Design a protein with these regions (language model features):
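Non-catalytic cap/lid and distal C-terminal segments of serine-dependent acyl enzymes
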Residues: 1-231
Length: 231
């Protein structure tokens, strides 16, 4: 049976022991990963090494929460609600693979609260949805269904991505990072045509932690996240 404990387990890390950081970064793991993997694979250390003003929360948003459709409720109750009282200047979400999908789902409900989304090798839907958008000529030309259907979550994810990329000044910034041999690359290539200049990060590699660590370092070193979350 898929597990979805209440409350959702989280692991926090602070930039400073004496003062709150400017930015909050929430990290959502992939299908077979957990909240501790970000620390084990050096993602948190990479932030500290660059002396960024970033506090992090790694959420154990495993597949059970998605299957039971409690992911958004738990993120709201166990992550966002406690953090609102702290009044961070900026709130960012980063998700890997399935966590990338989760990040978009959160953004659909909390668009005005979020500063940016970092989608690393995100799952963006099954082949039929990707084929449909590709045949339409890409995200900009694709026409979503006339009626919003929460049950058709994959097309609703792309409806939001189409809206957000077409309205970058009023939507959270979207950053896309992926390996060139990733099995989910078809969806990544579609989204890549719509993201802003400077928001696309590519490297050699497949769907695993090696290229993800490289992409993460590149993002931290070259994106405007570094200046936005400077001390």
């Amino acid at each position: 049976m898929l597990s979805a404990p209440t409350p959702m387990h989280t692991v926090s890390s602070q930039a400073s022991p004496t003062q709150q950081a400017r930015c909050l970064l929430v990290l959502l793991p992939g299908f077979s990963d957990s909240d501790t993997d970000f620390d084990q694979h050096g993602f948190i250390a990479d932030i500290h090494a660059r002396k960024l003003s970033v506090d992090t929360i790694s959420a154990n948003a495993t597949i059970g929460y998605y299957a039971k459709r409690t992911i958004l409720g738990r993120i709201e109750t166990d992550v966002l609600a406690p953090m609102r009282a702290k009044r961070y200047e900026q709130t960012w979400f980063m998700g890997i693979s399935m966590g990338g999908l989760g990040t978009i789902l959160v953004a659909q409900q909390h668009e005005k609260e979020l500063t940016g989304l970092i989608l690393m090798a995100p799952y963006l839907g099954d082949d039929d949805v990707i084929d449909e958008i590709a045949k339409a000529g890409g995200v900009a030309k694709w026409k979503p269904p006339a009626v919003v259907d929460p049950e058709d979550y994959q097309r609703e994810v792309w409806r939001w991505l189409k809206h957000a990329t077409a309205n970058p000044t009023t939507s959270p910034a979207i950053y896309l990072a992926s390996g060139d041999q990733d099995p989910l690359a078809r969806g990544h290539r579609l989204l890549a045509t719509a993201v802003q200049d400077g928001h696309l990060f590519r490297t050699r590699g497949n769907h695993d932690w090696g290229p993800w660590r490289t992409l993460w370092a590149n993002f931290l070193d070259t994106s405007d996240f570094r200046t936005r979350c400077a001390p």
